[in-house]
Amino acid sequence: MPNPLQKSLHGYLSKIKKETGKLQLSSSHSFSSSKNWVLGKHPKKLSFSFKHRRRSSKTRFSKEEPVYHQDSAHAATLSDIDRFLEENFKSLCIRDDQEDDQHQARVTKNKEKRESSSDDSDDDDDDDDYRHRFERTWGHAVYDSPKQPPDLLRTERLSPPPGSSEGRPSMETTSTSSERQSRSTLVLPENCIAVLRYTDEPQEDFRQSMVEMMESKLGMRESEVDWDLMEELLFCYLDLNDKKSHKFILSAFVDLIIALREKEKRITRKGHVRSLSTRAARDRLRKRMIMSDN
């Protein structure tokens, strides 16, 4: 009986020894797994794997890179990661000069396109905004003339009401800037209405409008110039228009003043000649009367 008992006991002890070995192996494997998890969650990631790597001619790695064997480690250490980032910093964070130039050119081109499109939309918005403010200021007494191309200067006109029996003052103004102030407090001359008009020759239109207003006020007869009226009209033109249009208004006003000065001089000379001729006629008549008495 000693042999069967010895065999069974030997078998039992061998089983216990095998189970103990399995437990130790499992414990060491779990420790290795926890160690790999602490050092890196992806130990086999190609970005940090240096095992059996072949360096090509274009790689930037140093020749002194450590080559790890299969039994040395399963994951990259923190020092390996730092070395990798340090050696490849330029390739990761710095663009090449050519790429920078191309990127800058694309950014500049896109910016120019946005600015050009925004300028066009701003011009349209300025036109619409100014038209609405013009209509709110002058109410329903607004007549719109056929619109010219957008590159032409835009004008406004104050003209006599339709069907008027007598000539009424008319007034033109231009506007080219988006910075227009509210004109709700402006008082127009009597029997004048505001009319929006477009023109490509603002100075000539201003001058013609001033001439029409003077003729409607003074009539076709030759008489002295009403300078108070001219001053009132000038300030009215300036108040109605933007500052960039003032140069056209002043140029037209100067041209009109020169013409009116010449006209006034002619009227004065004619009156002086008429007075001289009348005095001479009286002197001749007096002499004849004296001679007849004698």
From Swiss-Prot:
- A Gene Ontology cellular-component term: nucleus
Could you tell me the keywords of this UniProt record? Nucleus, Repressor, Transcription, Transcription regulation
Q: Can the keyword Nucleus be found in this entry's annotation?
A: yes
**Which intervals carry biased composition (Acidic residues)?**
118-128
Region annotated Disordered sits at: 49-72, 96-129, 141-185
Q: Where is the OVATE domain?
A: 195-259
- Known partners and oligomeric status: Interacts with KNAT2 and KNAT3.
Protein's UniProt name: Transcription repressor OFP14
